[in-house]
Swiss-Prot record:
GO terms for molecular function: double-stranded DNA binding; RNA binding. This is Protein CSN12 homolog. Residues 226-431 form the PCI domain. It holds the Pfam family PCI. SMART domains: PAM (SM00753). It comes from the Eukaryota. Belongs to the CSN12 family.
């Protein structure tokens, strides 16, 4: 007579032998339904004889799974559930090594459940993670790890399993779902603050000699490709590679545009736009349409009404105030360095305004020669809204010269400086080649 345990083992054995993703996934999920979950939790611990029908590499998966079910349904312990599920996913990684990509969906589901259990544990018991991190910092031997690091190691194992699959047929390869593992792994590394590890993962991806799926491929891979592109763009942003960062985010936006209902991806879109909009302004002097501002009023207020407006009008006081006001948001989104560099656009607009005023007052042929003192006064008014002769300038002439030298060297102004005469000599043809806003 068959027992519930033997029936379950037979079901596992059949699903593995038939390479049935859906059935095997249902055999190792922590949520098979409350009744089935309770039944599995009360199975006796299987011995070697019980497990004999199951392919050898999958036996530890079943053993760790049944241990996990007891932690979930009997002990009701979120801590034990996390560690047991982490053990099961590691066993599944080992078992999946020799399988084709039929194993991807069960593995993806197991990893998704592991991440969810970690998130619940972290939300309900934040002191546990804080204590682990504290113990990790105080451990002189450095041989322990936090739950988040354990999670990272496990997902990294799944990523390597996918990346190193040597099957040349992509349709049968575990690489087909690589963006799920890549997107989640790089996100975890960011949470850990280990950006070098995130870079090493990206380097490994670029270094593979095997074909990879298209970023805008079908199915759920799109979602994780967007996650990967977003965090990869942040890495480029931190390296001050603004062009590459923009390209990655544009690709992410192209993928999101394929969704039938934009409302389903509005949050993702806004998260990308908060970085993409200043990149487009800095790289190409592009500003978004009114339609974008209407869809994202928070971005409109922060950018169009404040930071971008200050840049477009050369208003240094408004720019500095907005930079201070939104400092935390900019730091959180890796944008603070970019906006510090965008201050040069503010200077540029101010210099052009000054030159325009001088030209209107002096129509002589030498109006392209601008004294530094004129620009110094413009900087003072833009910074403090006023100037009295008794006041000290916010920018001395050396600082003004330095600002102009940077604008010239970066190609934003055509001309040269005369230190002896304390003036800038502008090109008569096109002194401000990069100031066209579109």
């Amino acid at each position: 007579m068959n027992t519930p345990l033997s029936d379950y083992i037979q079901k596992v054995c059949l699903s593995v032998n038939l390479e049935d993703s859906q059935k095997f996934r249902s055999c190792i999920t922590i949520n098979p339904g409350i009744n089935e979950g309770t039944i599995r939790a009360h199975f006796p611990e299987p011995n070697d004889f019980d497990l004999h029908p199951i392919p050898e590499k999958f036996r530890n998966v079943v053993k760790s799974y049944l241990k996990l079910m007891k932690s979930v349904y009997i002990a009701n312990s979120i801590n034990a559930s996390f560690f047991d599920l982490n053990e099961m996913v590691n066993n599944l990684n080992r078992a999946a090594d020799t399988q084709t990509n039929w194993i991807n969906q069960p593995l993806i589901n197991a990893c998704t459940e592991l991440i969810s259990v970690y998130q619940v544990r972290s939300k309900n018991f934040p002191e546990e993670e804080e204590m682990e991190l504290s113990n990790l910092e105080n451990n002189e031997y450095g041989n322990s790890s936090s739950s988040l690091e354990r999670l990272a190691a496990t997902i990294n194992g799944s990523f390597k399993l996918s990346l190193n699959d040597k099957n040349l047929d992509l349709s049968q390869s575990k690489r087909l779902d690589i963006y799920f593992f890549l997107g989640n792994l790089i996100k975890i590394y960011f949470k850990l603050g280990k950006l070098e590890l995130a870079k090493s993962v990206e380097k490994a991806l670029k270094g593979t000699r095997f074909n990879l799926p298209k970023l805008n491929g079908a199915g759920s891979s799109k979602r994780y490709a967007v996650t990967y592109l977003y965090y990869s763009a942040l890495l480029s942003l931190d390296d001050a590679d603004f062009t590459t960062s923009e390209e990655k985010l544009v690709k992410a936006m192209e993928i999101l545009s394929c969704y039938k209902d934009p409302k389903n991806v509005k949050n993702q879109t806004e998260k990308i736009l908060i970085i993409l909009l200043p990149l487009k302004l800095y790289n190409k002097r592009l500003t978004p349409s009114n339609e974008i501002w209407e869809k994202f009023p928070k971005l409109k207020f922060m950018y169009k009404d404040n930071l971008f407006d200050a840049i477009k009008n050369g208003n240094l006081k408004k720019f500095d105030q907005a930079l201070t006001k939104y400092q935390l948001i900019l730091l959180k989104n890796h944008l603070y360095l970019l906006f510090e560099m965008m201050k040069s656009l503010c200077y540029l607009k101010l210099v052009k305004k000054t030159v325009s005023i001088i030209h209107s007052l002096n129509s002589e042929t030498k109006s392209h020669i601008v004294p530094l003192s004129a620009i110094q006064l413009a900087l003072e008014f833009s910074t403090n809204d006023s100037y009295k002769e008794s006041d000290k300038f916010a920018y001395n002439l050396d600082a003004v010269e330095c600002i102009l030298a940077n604008l010239i060297s970066s190609g934003k102004i055509k001309g040269y400086l005369s230190h002896a005469n304390r003036c800038i000599v502008l090109s008569k043809a096109n002194a401000f080649p990069s100031l066209e806003y579109k």
